[in-house]
């Protein structure tokens, strides 16, 4: 799977993710964006949830599993609100929002 295929699949399911998980914004960062992915690379996905969304840890893990199943590759899900300043700056510089 390449970056364009990942983007296409996520865009196709964006409304469903918004309804089910209250996803406000979703983007890809990391090795796939930089074109450095290997056969064992996971897909790094940054998500921001709608204000006031009440999601449990199980909901977030469920979203990560659903995205992994959808893309056919392991997904590492990162919530935008939990980014640490140092690493967060680098992620926000390279993220490709859909």
Describe these PLM feature segments.
Residues 1-25, 33-39, 50-98:
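Catalytic core of pol beta-like nucleotidyltransferases
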Residues 28:
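Hydrophobic alpha-helical positions that pack around
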Residues 40-45:
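A short, structured beta-strand/loop element
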